């Protein structure tokens, strides 16, 4: 069976504002299956932004587990992320899931991987997915050389990634916490 490919998810934190955005393309082999998938969401009473890349079903499974961890730990993003990463690494069924998450609240942004890593990005900028490197490079350049807001940086970074990555389209969803 062919693998689902790609997406681009990027997050930018500047001051007390954070933006998280992603494109909407889902690809199976060389076919675009859907152009308007929603891979960025608000969870935990709209206090946490989360974006996912990887297998769509896998990502939804992880998203449900992450939201349960947030509930269990009263919205403590770091603790919920560490607990999810522990489960992901040690549970046989979860280990097979192929996805990555970026989660952000008012004060913290984290990348959560299937290897059990919970990463706090340097400079408040991170990106995942097939177009992640393009988006992250664009976001860093824009953050260092402009006064654009996090939302504007995310939007422009996704535009650049969509121009360069065949698995990323220009149908963007961006959420912010200010």
UniProtKB/Swiss-Prot annotation:
GO terms for cellular component: HslUV protease complex; proteasome core complex. It catalyses: ATP-dependent cleavage of peptide bonds with broad specificity. Allosterically activated by HslU binding. Keywords: Allosteric enzyme, Cytoplasm, Hydrolase, Metal-binding, Protease, Sodium, Threonine protease. InterPro entries: ATP-dep_Prtase_HsIV_su, Ntn_hydrolases_N, Proteasome_sua/b, Proteasome_suB-type. The active site is at 7. Na(+) binds at residues 162, 165, 168. It is found in: Cytoplasm. One of its GO terms (biological process) is proteolysis involved in protein catabolic process. One of its GO terms (molecular function) is metal ion binding. The keyword Hydrolase applies. Its EC number is 3.4.25.2. Its main location: cytoplasm. The keyword Ribosomal protein does not apply. PANTHER family: ATP-DEPENDENT PROTEASE SUBUNIT HSLV, METALLOPROTEASE TLDD. Belongs to the peptidase T1B family. HslV subfamily. A double ring-shaped homohexamer of HslV is capped on each side by a ring-shaped HslU homohexamer. The assembly of the HslU/HslV complex is dependent on binding of ATP. Protease subunit of a proteasome-like degradation complex believed to be a general protein degrading machinery. This is ATP-dependent protease subunit HslV. It comes from Burkholderia ambifaria (strain ATCC BAA-244 / DSM 16087 / CCUG 44356 / LMG 19182 / AMMD) (Burkholderia cepacia (strain AMMD)). The gene is hslV.
